[in-house]
Amino acid sequence: MDSGQPWFPKIHTKEVRRRLSSLNIATPSSSPCNMNWQSLEPKHIINDNVYGTVKVPRPIDKLIDTVEFQRLRHLKQTGLVYLVYPNCEHSRFVHSLGTFSLAYALVDKLRHSQPSLNITESDLICTSVAALLHDVGHGPFSHLFDGEFAKRNGSRFKHEDMSILIIKKIMNKPEIKSEFACILGETDEEYAKSVTLITELISGKPFDFQDMDGFKDLPADVREETVKNEWAIIGCGPEKSFLFDVVSNSYNGHDVDKMDYLLRDSKASGVGITFSESTLERLFNHVRVVIDPNSGLKRIAYSIKCIGDLKAIGDSRQELHSKVYQHKAVRFMETLMVDALINAGDFLKYKGSNGELYSLKNVTEDVDAFLKTTDYVEQEILNSQITDPKMIEAQTALLKIQRREIGCKLGYFEMNPENATQLKGNCNNQTGAAEVVKKVGQKMKEILEQMDDTEEMDGKLKDIQFTVMHSVLGRGLDDKTHPIERQIFYDGKPSEHEGKQVVGFYPSEDYVINNCPRMATKWEIFVMGDRSLRKEPLLADRVKRALQLAGESEKFLTPRKRSPQDSPDEVSSSCSTAKRRLEFGSS
C-alpha cells in the first residue's frame, strides 16, 4: 500500500475524489498521535459503486467472512422495490460495507483533527463494527418482515433486537475473540464491556433525558448532575457521548447509516434527491465535536454553513419514501407477499440451536433458526409440494406478483396527521393512519352505493372491489419535528477552532419557521382497484370521487373552495409561510 495515500472512502465521481484528498485523513499506521496502535492497513479493497472502493482493515475482515454477515448478500436492501425499480437489487451486504466505510472515515477524521477527544483504537473499532453489523438482524424482505408481517403475526419483533443477539453470537466466537481481544480488551470483563458498547451504539438512546419536561430550564450545575445520573450507557462514559451520533443517531437521525442508504438507494433507483455525494463531502469537511448547550455533552456538530446540507437528509428521506420505498405498486405487492408469508408460515421449518424445528411464524425465537431465513423464502413457497389450501393460497399470491396481477391506483389524497384528531391520540403513528384507512374505506362503500342508486348504474358501483391503503411519509423523527431542529452547529470553519472547546448551538426559531414545514410528516391515503377499471374510465372516476368525498366527510381532508381563476398551488405557497408565523406567534 502507498503510505502517502489517505485512508478514507473515495466518492466515485472524479471531481469529488479530487476534493476529498483535501480532508487530510492520514493512514492510521502513520498517525503521530497514536504511534502504539496496531497497524490497521487495509486487508481487503472492495469495489463499490458509490464510493469507488471500500477498504477493510484487519481484523474487520474476519467479521465479513462469517456466515452471519455473508447471509446479508441474500437480503435485498429495499425489499420488493426491485419489482418497480429493477436496478434496486442491491443487498444489505453492500449497504453494511458502505455504512462501515463512512463510520470509520468519520471517527478517524475526528481522531486526527481533535486529539483532545482521546479517541482510542477501541473506540474506532467498536464504532466500525457497530456500523458493519447494524443490519445483521434483518429478516426476509427487510422491513416487511419486522413491519406488516410481524404485526399480522402478532409479534413484537424488531430487527435491532435480533441484531444485538447476532452481534453477541459473532463477537464471542473463539476465532473472532482471539482477533479482537488485543484491541477490545484482553480480559473477559473488558472484552464484554466493548461488545456491550458495540450493541449500545446501535440501540442505545443516551440523549432521551433531554426531552424531560423542564430539563432545559434547569441551572447549569443541576443539568450537569442530571446528565451524570441519567447516563444509562454501560460501554462508555459521557465523555464519549459523541460516538452515539455516528451509526444510529436517535436524537436527530443524521447518521452514516442514513447517509449511505440515501445515496445508494437513490443511485440504484435513479430517483434524484437533494442529498448528494458532494453534500456528503462537504459535511465531512466541516464536522467537529462540540459541547451541547443544553446537556453539556460532547456531540457531533457541523458548520452553520452546512445547515442546508443537513436539512437535505430529512427531506431526501421523505422523498425516497414517497417515490421509492412506498411506491403504490410496491405497497400493493407487499400486501400480497405478507399474505403469502402468513399462509405459508406454518409449513416452512428451520432448524434451531437445539435441533428443534421452528416455523417461519416463530423463527425469531431462536437465533440459529432465524439465520437460515433469507429472501429465498419466496422460492421455498413457490417450489413447495405441500397441497394444503393455505400453501396453495400463498403460492397464488406470489404468482399474482410474478404475473403483475396487481391493482392500479385510482386516486389518493394527502393529509395532515393533525386532521385525525378524532382518533383519540392515535393520529401520530402507523396505527392512526391505519384507522384513517379503515374509516375512509367504510365511508367509500356507503358513498358508492348512494352513487349507484342516484346515477342508476345497475349495481356496477356497488360491486367494485377496491383496497384503501396508506403511506406514512416522515423525515425520520416524530410528526412535528424536522430533524434539522435537533442538529447542533458551530460558527466558522473547523480550522478556526483547533485546540479549543467550542459550545455549539441549535438552529434559530426564525430559520425553522421560514424553512421547515409545520408538520414534518404527511400521510398519503390512496385507493387501489382492479386493473380492468382502466378500461372503465367512468367507474374509475367515481371511485376517485368517492375517495375524495370520504376524506372530506370524515374531516381528514379539508374541502377546497376557490374561484376558477385561482391557482391552488399559488394560494398554498403564498399563505404557508404567513400561516406558520401566525401559529408560532400564538403559541
From Swiss-Prot:
One of its GO terms (molecular function) is metal ion binding. The keyword Repeat does not apply. Zn(2+) binds at H95, H134, D135, D257. Has deoxynucleoside triphosphate (dNTPase) activity. dNTPase activity acts as a regulator of DNA precursor pools by regulating dNTP pools. Phosphorylation acts as a switch to control dNTPase-dependent and -independent functions. Gene3D superfamilies: Hypothetical protein af1432. The modification Phosphothreonine is found at T558. It catalyses: a 2'-deoxyribonucleoside 5'-triphosphate + H2O = a 2'-deoxyribonucleoside + triphosphate + H(+). Coiled coil: none annotated. Residues 554-587 are annotated as: Disordered. Residues 92-262 form the HD domain. Does not hydrolyze dGMP and dGDP. Shows significantly reduced capability to hydrolyze the chain terminator triphosphates ddGTP, ddITP, ddTTP or 3'-azido-3'-deoxythymidine (AZT), in the presence of dGTP activator. Able to hydrolyze an anti-cancer agent, araCTP. Homodimer. Homotetramer; in dGTP-bound form. Binds 1 zinc ion per subunit. Its cofactor is Zn(2+). One of its GO terms (biological process) is dGTP catabolic process. Allosterically activated and regulated by GTP or dGTP. Allosteric activation promotes the formation of highly active homotetramers. Phosphorylation impairs homotetramerization, thereby inhibiting dNTPase activity. It comes from the Eukaryota. Keywords: Allosteric enzyme, Chromosome, GTP-binding, Hydrolase, Metal-binding, Nucleotide-binding, Nucleus, Phosphoprotein, Zinc. The lineage of its organism: Eukaryota, Metazoa, Ecdysozoa, Nematoda, Chromadorea. GO terms for cellular component: chromosome; nucleus. This is Deoxynucleoside triphosphate triphosphohydrolase sahd-1. It is an enzyme of class 3 (hydrolase).
